[in-house]
Amino acid sequence: MGRKKIQITRIMDERNRQVTFTKRKFGLMKKAYELSVLCDCEIALIIFNSSNKLFQYASTDMDKVLLKYTEYNEPHESRTNSDIVETLRKKGLNGCESPDDQRYFEEETFSKLIEDSDFVFKRDPALNKKENRGCDSPDPDGSYVLTPHTEEKYKKINEEFDNMMRSHKISPGLPQQTFPMSVTVPVSNPNTLPYSSPGNTMVTASLAASASLTDARMLSPPPTTLHRNVVSPGLPQRPPSTGNAGVMLCSSDLSVPNGAGTSPVGNGFVNPRASPSHLGPTGGNVLGKVMPTKSPPPPGGNLVMNSRKPDLRVVIPPSSKGMMPPLNTQRVTSSQGTQPLATPIVSVATPSLAPQGLIYSAMPTAYNTDYPLTSADLSMLQGFNSPGILPLGQVSAWQQHHVGQAALSSFVATGQLSQGSNLSINTNQNINIKSEPISPPRDRITPSGFQSHQHHQHQPRPEMDSLSSSSSSYDGSDREDVRNDFHSPIGLGRPANNEDRDSPSVKRMRMDAWVT
């Protein structure tokens, strides 16, 4: 909005003249004040209106300025209206208002302030007594009018600010968010898994070392009545916590002297001197045992197995006869039909592994005909015997007995997995029930393992091959026979012959339970 330039002539309207006088008089005093402060000078204004009413302004004291004025006799600059008009004509303004003159309001807006012109000076005595010297201008508040339009704008701004604060205000009553963490540790609950003893837990080594899981209700899998849990071989594997390869432990009640637990060590066996916090809740009679596989894991695995995927299987057996299922057999297949499921097994008779600090199993492996368990070895197991484990006095006779008569009530198969990968546990819901004969076939099973003596004679191997060999995948006719009157912490493995190794057919695992 530009300035309205007016002709500098006498205002004929008395009302407008009074308004203009009030406005410009104050402007003149304001300019005098600014000049006195900025330029450090003394100013005195003496104004008589048309009614001969006096208005004066002095930067300090009017009497002092007037005294100095009367005593001053030197030549000085003195101007009148004619001098100012002449100067304005030279600048080409032709008597119009100078653009430097500030106009606060239009003259007609001050018509209502005619009667209040004298009230301004009475309200603010600083204009007369020169007390307001620290501010820019002694402008009284009465010269500013709050119009209804301006007041409406202020109210609108306040409402918008309040709405913004309410929209961004965080409610203090909101509960703190919690994020559930999924754990791949299925815990067998007796109410949901009837084929497992209370407290049987499958724990990966790195997870068991980081947390102790004690509440079985919080870790129970969904209530799908499964009887066994099967490890899916095609899933990625958990990184190892021991610096070697990832080892999955099926932890159970292991009677170790001095209350020490077990934990995986670098050689793939179970260390009895480790901290007991490395194992979860225990229950049952299972002894962890690590065995190499014939099919090595992917690159990045352990030093022996370095080319193929491992084949894993996990079975959680009952802890007593009362927990056995009805007289039928369950058949669990892998979640990937094309992936073979075989238990990687390390022979405890391998001469390349140091026997110190190891827990030997009572199970004769595929090559234990050259390295049988002696009485000294059996005496080492006296501290580990429990009511659920095979009595050690019967081990020798049991080794001579047919393997088909030995049942697996507690079985742990722990695979030597590759480094830097995850180990996942799946519960397979494909359960096929099939009747089985009372006794297993005897043509393929011998007391020396799951391979006949003829295979040992026609396929001789060095003793060091026990680290790189493993039990192959089970085909449709192979199976493991389980009896409910025998409890032993053993892991069985069967090296496959050349026909099974070269067979292109789809391999699968069968775990059958039969009762005599």
Curated annotation (Swiss-Prot):
The keyword Iron does not apply. Restricted to the somitic mesoderm of early embryos. Expressed in the head region of neurula stage embryos and in body muscle (myotomes) of the tadpole. Expressed in all tissues examined in the adult. GO terms for molecular function: DNA-binding transcription factor activity, RNA polymerase II-specific; histone deacetylase binding; protein dimerization activity; protein kinase binding; RNA polymerase II cis-regulatory region sequence-specific DNA binding; sequence-specific DNA binding. SMART domains: MADS. Residues 58-86 bind DNA. Residues 318-339, 420-516 are annotated as: Disordered. Coiled coil: none annotated. Pfam families: HJURP_C (PF12347), SRF-TF (PF00319). Changing residue 350 to A: No effect on phosphorylation by NLK. Changing residue 439 to A: No effect on phosphorylation by NLK. Residues 476-486, 497-516 have a biased composition (Basic and acidic residues). The modification Phosphoserine is found at residue 386. Residues 1-100 are annotated as: Interaction with hdac9. May regulate muscle-specific transcription in the embryo and may regulate transcription of a variety of cell types in the adult. Binds to the sequence 5'-CTA[TA]4TAR-3'. Acts downstream of nlk2 in anterior neural development, including eye formation. Interacts with hdac9 and nlk2. Belongs to the MEF2 family. This is Myocyte-specific enhancer factor 2A homolog. It comes from Xenopus laevis (African clawed frog). The gene is mef2a.
